[in-house]
Structures are given as structure tokens and as C-alpha cells.
Amino acid sequence: MTEHAILVLEDGTVFEGDAVGANGLSVGEVVFNTALTGYQEILTDPSYAYQLVTLTYPHIGNTGCTDQDDEANKVWAAGLIVRDVPRRPSNWRSQISLSDWLAARGVVAIAGIDTRKLTRILREKGAQHGALMAGEIDVGKAQDAAHQFAGIKGMDLAKVVSTKQGYSWYEGQLDLDRNECKRAAPQYKVVAYDYGVKLNILRMLAERGCDLTVVPAQTPADEVLALCPDGVFLSNGPGDPEPCDYAVAAIKTFIMRRVPIFGICLGHQLLAQAVGARVVKMSHGHHGANHPVQDLRSGRVMITSQNHGFAVDEATLPNNVRVTHRSLFDGTNQGIELLDVPAFSFQGHPEASPGPHDVDVLFDRFITMMAAQS
């Protein structure tokens, strides 16, 4: 028999549905994501830590799950909210159904609710604190949990999701025809800061000839410089960049030493903070794989993958920083470059996973930048 589940928002709204994962209680910031595919990649993306993810596409789970699609070694999202989960997945790569995968990973999830109504609430009122409860239901307890959640603003989540020890990475993207990872001869020594890095980012860098050393978020700049890197990569990650003063301090050192820098997502915001800009909390953020972004230099419009709840305040950028990309949804900043130092960053996810690869050329730009410096 199907277990019951509820979703309670901080504004008092209660949604009733069916449990499609583990039983229990989970709290977080409720957000909506407009991607049609890639649910497994989304749930294992560390950038979704402490978030209850609503997927707006109605049928989620059609293709099942496979270990090869994980973006980290665990599920980082706080929970999953969907309209419908098909009973039988159909895909030649599928190893397990989404429901069984969620239960095995201990993820609380709800299906059978009006996700269109929920999305409209989040769009109009902004991201809400919420609580998911499955199994034994206690609405009052769930309401208390939703109200007691402190929220993501002010939380330093980068050091929570980051690796505790440094490691090397060599594998490129998976070649499905051969069932093996592509490899390229290493040409550039790159240190990648793990603020919540996705595996596909490391794969795309390795595939372009980067000899990668991944280091914890709080690694001091002098330890990185001792490795004599050709470039430093600032990864994606969850939460508010404001508490990450250790990261800003390290980035300032790299800028001063003119080490080539490429940042994405949280790394983009940290680079902006390092040059003196402010980062502000957005109403409901950008979460999806269909976000149009314009390259202001060429005028070209690209469809991008996005996942962030904070944005760089362009008005606070100094004169030596040029805005390179802007969202066509709301005009928020999507990219910057320093005019006097080899450093640039992008707010979205050029590695996609899930999503389009319109902006994966940014990885090539990083390679070109390192080649010019060397």
C-alpha cells in the first residue's frame, strides 16, 4: 500500500500526496526547476544542498536511474517534489527505478500534488521554507519544522559539501558506445576548488588536457601556489557566498599573482566578491536547463543550465571588470571578466548535466587563457 506524504510551506499551504521515496521528515528551501530531464543529476548536484526540488515537468522517472549519471557520491538535495512517477522506467541504461533509488538513498519525496499550483506560489511569493514528511504524518510537526528552518542565506554550505581531502582527477566524459571514459594527454596543471563541484565539470576539464588536482574549499592560496598551477578553477556550489571569506581571500591572492582563473556558479559570485562587488539574494532564483543568456560581446543568445539563488549586483562592480553575459529572463548578471588580469566567470553551468552545451566553449576559453600565460 502506498504511504502518504505531505509538503508544508512556511506560508501555511499544505499539499497532500503519495510517498515515492524514503519515509521521514526533511526540511529546506523549496525551489522549482524547469528541466525536462536529468533528475538524477539534479538530485546529486551539491549545489542543491538544503533545497527541496520541485520539478515542473509532470512525468519524472521515465528513464530510471544508473550509477553513471551521479554528479557526486551522494544525494545532496533535501527532497524531491513531482507530479507523477511512472511505474515502469524504460531505458537501456536503467539499473533501478527512481522510486527505489530514492528509497535506497534515504531521500524523502512526494508525488501526486499539483506542481503547477506550487510553482505559481514560488514564482509569486519567492522561494519558501518547507518541510516534506512521508510515512507517519503529523501536520503540526511539519509546520513547526518549516518555520524553524533558518534558511540558506548566511549559511556557509561550501565547506559542508566540499571534499575533506585533495585528490587527482584524470577521467574525461563517458563514451557510451565504448562504455569507457575519454582521456586526453595532460597539458595544463589546474587546481580546482571544490565548493560543491559536479563530476561532469571535472570530466570536461580533463578531456581538454587539464591535469586536475581537486582541493577542499578552505585550502589557503599558498598551498595552491606551491603546486605551481597553470590555472585555478572555482567550482559551483550551494548557498550564500557571503560567509565564504576564506575563498575570497584566496582568490584575491590569485588575482594579485595573475594566475588564470575560471569560475562558475558559486565560483562566479566569489570572484565578483573578490574584486569588491556585492551578491544579493534572488526572489526565486534560476533553476532549470532552458534559460536564455546573451553574450554581450557577440550578441549571441545561448540556452543554458542554471541553478542559483543569489546574483551579482552589477552596480557594485569596479571599473576594471566588464560584464560579459546577462540573463534574458530578468536581466541579472551572468558573467564577468577582469580587464587587467586573466580571470573570468559565468553564473550558469557550462557543463550542463543536465542541459544544453551552448556555453561549453567557456572551458576552451580557459585553456586558451592558460596557453597564453604559459
UniProtKB/Swiss-Prot annotation:
EC number per UniProt: 6.3.5.5
Domain of life of the source: Bacteria
BP-aspect Gene Ontology terms: 'de novo' pyrimidine nucleobase biosynthetic process; 'de novo' UMP biosynthetic process; glutamine metabolic process; L-arginine biosynthetic process
Keyword line: Amino-acid biosynthesis, Arginine biosynthesis, ATP-binding, Glutamine amidotransferase, Ligase, Nucleotide-binding, Pyrimidine biosynthesis
Active site: C265 (nucleophile), H349, E351
Gene Ontology molecular functions: ATP binding; carbamoyl-phosphate synthase (glutamine-hydrolyzing) activity; glutaminase activity
Catalyzed reactions per annotation: hydrogencarbonate + L-glutamine + 2 ATP + H2O = carbamoyl phosphate + L-glutamate + 2 ADP + phosphate + 2 H(+)
Domain Glutamine amidotransferase type-1, residue spans: 189-374
Disulfide pattern: none
Pathway assignment: Amino-acid biosynthesis; L-arginine biosynthesis; carbamoyl phosphate from bicarbonate: step 1/1; Pyrimidine metabolism; UMP biosynthesis via de novo pathway; (S)-dihydroorotate from bicarbonate: step 1/3
Keyword ATP-binding found: yes
Chain spans, region CPSase: 1-186
UniProt keyword Signal, yes or no: no
Gene3D superfamilies linked to this entry: 3.40.50.880, Carbamoyl-phosphate synthase small subunit, N-terminal domain
Enzyme class: ligase
Chain positions recorded as L-glutamine binding sites: S47, G237, G239, L266, Q269, N307, G309, F310
Any Pfam family hit: GATase
InterPro entries in the record: Anth_synth/Amidotransfase, CarbamoylP_synth_ssu, CarbamoylP_synth_ssu_N, CarbP_synth_ssu_N_sf, Class_I_gatase-like, CPSase_GATase1, GATASE
Function: Small subunit of the glutamine-dependent carbamoyl phosphate synthetase (CPSase). CPSase catalyzes the formation of carbamoyl phosphate from the ammonia moiety of glutamine, carbonate, and phosphate donated by ATP, constituting the first step of 2 biosynthetic pathways, one leading to arginine and/or urea and the other to pyrimidine nucleotides. The small subunit (glutamine amidotransferase) binds and cleaves glutamine to supply the large subunit with the substrate ammonia.
Family per similarity comment: Belongs to the CarA family.
Subunit structure of this chain's protein: Composed of two chains; the small (or glutamine) chain promotes the hydrolysis of glutamine to ammonia, which is used by the large (or ammonia) chain to synthesize carbamoyl phosphate. Tetramer of heterodimers (alpha,beta)4.
Protein's recorded name: Carbamoyl phosphate synthase small chain
